[in-house]
A protein has these predicted regions:
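Conserved, mostly hydrophobic/aromatic
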Residues: 6, 18, 36, 51, ...
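Active-site mouth loops of central-metabolism enzymes
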Residues: 21-34, 93-106, 134
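Short, acidic/polar
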Residues: 30-43, 100-118, 163-171
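Active-site groove signature of glycoside hydrolases
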Residues: 115-134
Length: 324
């Protein structure tokens, strides 16, 4: 496993981290706690040392599993979690004030609940789970994040940027008040490269790249006949003609890649890791074989320029999550 610095936190984190939304259950069906825990422990054996969870993942279930895993790990594991929006709206909506989303007392209380779930006195990284640039001039969130650090409840703080809106955090980064950003970055959504990544490098901000496989679209396993449990988030994500669109784009991508070595998910992960601004990439890995293959992929290093040029042509502007 290779390691990169998570910006000014100074944490040396594994290039492949663990995205723990799936192990919360609820919106991700088809797995078990036992299977998920085996996968995380295997990833840790192979060098993974960064796990990203959230209070909203299974109403704390993901955090409780992560806490148990960390206690059993026998080595230093960096843990990041998130404060959910109080109004339960993802992504953050324009025109809704921060007093309805992240009031001061709520941020503190949510963090304390997360710490209880995790079985920790301090979390390495606490993040706001959504962000709205209209809040930049308000004091509540600034005071809450500063007090989390002063009180020792969180070592560092960051923000998870709204889906497909990387530029919404540019002014936030310039305030100097956050240490990390989490952003969607993959072959289809390359938009953070334009403005966000240059700024994170300038301000020494850690970058957590989420959704590297586009919720499964870039695994190449989605067909027009693919079915998901109606309780599964992916049933919504791949609704309507979305599966048809994915199949068309993935087929075009495969044609262009030709004989490039590696499977589609391997190439997709290496695409993310070829960006020097990225500190860690956090795929979900609920099965041991996925943990092993993803970590083995990281060992192969960045893609060559010819392959990157091919992938650059496949940026795709879409929003399957729904309009904010």
């Amino acid at each position: 496993m290779n390691y990169r610095r998570l910006g000014r936190t100074g944490f040396e984190v594994s290039e492949i981290g663990y995205g723990a939304w799936g192990i919360g259950g609820a919106q991700w069906q088809g797995g078990t706690d036992e299977e998920s825990m085996r996968a995380v422990h295997r990833a840790i054996e192979l060098g993974l040392n960064f796990i990203d969870t959230a209070l909203a993942y299974g109403d704390g279930h993901s955090e409780r599993l992560v806490g148990k895993i960390v206690r059993e790990a026998g080595r230093r594991i960096y843990v990041a979690t998130k404060v959910p929006p109080k109004n339960q709206l993802w992504p953050a909506r324009r025109g809704i004030g921060i007093d309805q989303v992240f009031p001061y007392d709520y941020v503190i209380e949510s963090t304390e609940t997360s710490l209880k779930n995790l079985g920790m006195e301090t979390v390495d990284l606490q993040q706001l789970h959504v962000w709205n640039p209209e809040w930049i001039g308000r004091d509540e969130w600034k005071r809450a994040l500063e007090d989390l650090k002063k009180s020792g409840k969180a070592r560092f703080v960051g923000v998870s940027i709204n889906d497909h809106q990387p530029d919404s955090a540019l002014e936030l980064i310039r305030t100097g008040l956050i240490d990390t950003v989490q952003v969607i970055y993959n072959v289809f959504d390359q938009s953070p490269e334009r403005n966000l990544f240059p700024l994170t490098e300038q301000f020494n901000i850690g970058v957590i790249a989420r959704v590297p496989l586009d919720e499964g679209a870039l695994t190449g396993a989605i067909t027009e006949e693919t079915k998901f449990d109606e309780r599964d988030f992916r049933d919504y994500y791949f609704r309507g003609d979305h599966k048809k669109q994915v199949v068309e784009h993935v087929n075009a991508l495969r044609r262009d890649l030709g004989n490039v070595d590696g499977s589609l998910p391997e190439i997709a992960l290496r695409f993310c890791l070829s960006e020097p601004a990225v500190s860690t990439v956090i795929p979900g890995m609920r099965r041991v074989r996925h943990a092993e293959s993803n970590i083995a992929t990281a060992e192969k290093g960045p893609l060559d320029e010819k392959t990157m040029a091919v992938l650059r042509r496949h940026a795709w502007e879409k929003n399957f999550y729904g309009e904010p």
